[in-house]
């Protein structure tokens, strides 16, 4: 194999989408501030492109959005929040509530103020909320476009947030230094967050749209066997991660606060719920995807499921309230299984009742099986012998008068299982599906996605 082949097997030659599927923690950096201080301009500057809407009208950022960002080799998620209105409702206004949720979800915060306007009462209100949240904060004084304006930043020492960093989001001045400090804050937060898993415990995320029974299932599984792993200092929030003992085995459940808090009742909560779900999936090894069997499967249900599959996580599909279903509803769901769930026919599936505990004892077997498959590695010799057999049984269809053939294959990695196939020509999608289906029939892989990459190599002619 040449250097390009080695890159492919190691993962360096994979597409950007495939790299993102691998497990890696992504810190969340929220950009907050009152309206028209330049938050979206700063977001665009960090991203290196015009992604956020920027106007001179206060409050233009109505939809809160997140972006994948990178600085100095560190990947993180950047959240652009709405402005804080200094109206009669103050901190309790709807938009302030949304921004407060964003801060709650973030690992660190960049607080943007306007150096040309100076310190305002709204800025001071935001500082009180940030102190209550207990998150690391970097203070950015925007619109300091030149050295002559540096003195304007000194006033913001009064906020008590430490050094004010002078920047010009429009021109890029000082933004690099600001990011260096912000990324240091993210890394420090990561050391004390749930990313640090107690030795030997598998990380589980319990995800699903609101009101499917996540909190009920967590309580049913945990009973009284709970151990707090991580508290957020200075807040009254629930613990972030919890050790839950199920049938004598300890599991680390990710972001149980996100399960128990009724965040969907807040304005804009659908967006923040989605962000929180995505963050939990990125941190976990196994996603328990909960559905309400008594309700039709929604697009949101399928989106949560696809997020976990695309992230390369082991999954178990959990259908709650199954004991309340009549035969007609059960048959309806079984029909859906062959249509809406055709992408994950390989998934482990458990039908249960979180309220009564019916069949919850079946979860641990499914969880263990899914993680065992996620960790599974097939020896190269055994893999190639098997692929040779299925290729002989069903050769690839002719393409342009030629028949692509598999020359060699190897399993490049696990978590999830990733296979690299070297072939004499392009392998059609249908044939790749045939290979995946055959691998599952022979080796199991229940509960885990499989990634297959094909590298085209001409078969060397004998001299």
Curated annotation (Swiss-Prot):
Domain EngA-type G, first and last residues per copy: 27-190, 202-375
Alphabetical list of CDD domains matching this protein: EngA1, EngA2
Pfam families assigned to the protein according to its UniProt record, in alphabetical order: KH_dom-like, MMR_HSR1
Superkingdom of source: Bacteria
One example of a Gene Ontology biological process annotation: ribosome biogenesis
Annotated segments matching region Disordered: 1-20
Quaternary context: Associates with the 50S ribosomal subunit.
NCBIfam families, A to Z: GTPase_EngA, PRK03003.1, small_GTP
Family the UniProt entry places it in: Belongs to the TRAFAC class TrmE-Era-EngA-EngB-Septin-like GTPase superfamily. EngA (Der) GTPase family.
Role played: GTPase that plays an essential role in the late steps of ribosome biogenesis.
Name of the molecule in the record: GTPase Der
Provenance organism: Bifidobacterium longum (strain NCC 2705)
């Amino acid at each position: 194999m040449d250097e390009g082949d080695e890159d492919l097997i190691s993962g360096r030659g994979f597409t950007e989408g495939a790299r993102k599927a691998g497990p890696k923690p992504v810190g969340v950096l929220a950009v907050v501030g009152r309206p028209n201080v330049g938050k979206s301009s700063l977001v665009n500057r960090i991203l290196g492109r015009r992604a956020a809407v920027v106007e001179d009208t206060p409050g233009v950022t109505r939809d809160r959005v997140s972006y994948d960002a990178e600085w100095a080799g560190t990947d993180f998620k950047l959240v652009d929040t709405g402005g804080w209105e200094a109206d009669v409702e103050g901190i309790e206004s709807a938009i302030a509530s949304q921004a407060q949720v964003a801060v709650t979800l973030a690992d660190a915060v960049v607080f943007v103020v306007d150096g040309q306007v100076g310190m305002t009462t709204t800025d001071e209100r935001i500082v009180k909320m940030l102190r209550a949240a207990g998150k690391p904060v970097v203070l950015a004084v925007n619109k300091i476009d030149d050295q002559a304006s540096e003195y304007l930043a000194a006033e913001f020492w009064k906020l008590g947030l430490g050094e004010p960093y002078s920047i010009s989001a429009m021109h890029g001045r000082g933004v690099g230094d600001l990011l260096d400090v912000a990324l240091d804050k993210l890394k420090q937060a990561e050391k004390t967050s749930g990313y640090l898993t107690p030795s030997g415990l598998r990380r589980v995320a319990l995800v699903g749209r609101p009101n499917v029974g996540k909190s009920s299932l967590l309580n049913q599984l945990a009973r009284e066997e709970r151990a707090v792993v991580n508290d957020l200092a200075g807040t009254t929030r629930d613990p972030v991660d919890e050790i839950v003992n199920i049938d004598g085995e300890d599991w680390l459940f990710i972001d149980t606060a996100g399960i128990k808090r009724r965040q969907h009742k807040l304005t804009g909560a659908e967006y923040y719920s989605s962000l929180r779900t995505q963050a939990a999936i990125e941190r976990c090894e196994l996603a328990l995807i909960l559905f309400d069997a008594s309700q039709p499967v929604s697009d949101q249900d399928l989106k949560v499921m696809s997020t976990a599959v695309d992230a390369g996580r082991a999954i178990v599909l959990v259908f709650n309230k199954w004991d309340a279903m009549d035969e007609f509803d059960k048959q309806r769901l079984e029909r859906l299984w062959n249509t809406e769930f055709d992408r994950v026919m390989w998934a482990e599936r458990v039908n249960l009742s979180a309220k009564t505990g019916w069949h919850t004892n079946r979860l641990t077997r499914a969880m263990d099986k899914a993680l065992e498959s996620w960790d599974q590695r097939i020896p190269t010799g055994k893999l190639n012998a098997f692929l040779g057999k299925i290729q002989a049984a069903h050769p690839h269809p002719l393409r342009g008068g030629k028949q692509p053939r598999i020359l060699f294959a190897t399993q490049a990695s696990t978590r999830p299982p990733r296979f690299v196939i070297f072939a004499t020509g392009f392998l059609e999608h249908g044939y790749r599906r045939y290979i995946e289906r055959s691998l599952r029939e022979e080796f199991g892989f229940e509960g885990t996605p499989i990634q297959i990459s094909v590298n085209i190599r001409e078969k060397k002619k004998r001299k």
